[in-house]
Amino acid sequence: MSIQDYPSRLSDPQSRKAETFSYLPKMTAEQIKAQVQYIIDRGWNPAIEHSEPENAFSYYWYMWKLPMFGETDADAVLAEVDACIKANPNNHVRLIGYDNYAQSQGANMLVKRGDM
């Protein structure tokens, strides 16, 4: 049995992975919308956070406005994602689905990778 080395190096920012979907090809707009709809369909509260790429691996990200409690329109969530990206064009932007029942994050994904 051989062990495959993943070519990620601290010296190479492009090789760093963040969140589950970063190991897959970049998501299309339709795929991101499907993930937003998944969050909404489960009754989770969508929220958007952003951070400078150099601070992305610290614990604190800036919250974009408040979580969208009770939001049922995926397009409204995506409009806020776009507004966050326009206001913070060089930052990573992630979408979170807060699960009230489990009192935790049910989903957490990077929807825009910042410039490194």
From Swiss-Prot:
It is found in: Cytoplasm. Disulfide bonds: none annotated. One of its GO terms (molecular function) is ribulose-bisphosphate carboxylase activity. The keyword Zinc does not apply. RuBisCO catalyzes two reactions: the carboxylation of D-ribulose 1,5-bisphosphate, the primary event in carbon dioxide fixation, as well as the oxidative fragmentation of the pentose substrate. Both reactions occur simultaneously and in competition at the same active site. Although the small subunit is not catalytic it is essential for maximal activity. Can replace the endogenous type I ccbS gene in H.neapolitanus, reconstituting RuBisCO with about 10% of normal activity; the active enzyme is targeted to carboxysomes. HAMAP family: RuBisCO_S_bact (MF_00859). The basic functional RuBisCO is composed of a large chain homodimer in a 'head-to-tail' conformation. In form I RuBisCO this homodimer is arranged in a barrel-like tetramer with the small subunits forming a tetrameric 'cap' on each end of the 'barrel'. Heterohexadecamer of 8 large and 8 small subunits. Belongs to the RuBisCO small chain family. This is Ribulose bisphosphate carboxylase small subunit 1. It comes from Hydrogenovibrio crunogenus (strain DSM 25203 / XCL-2).
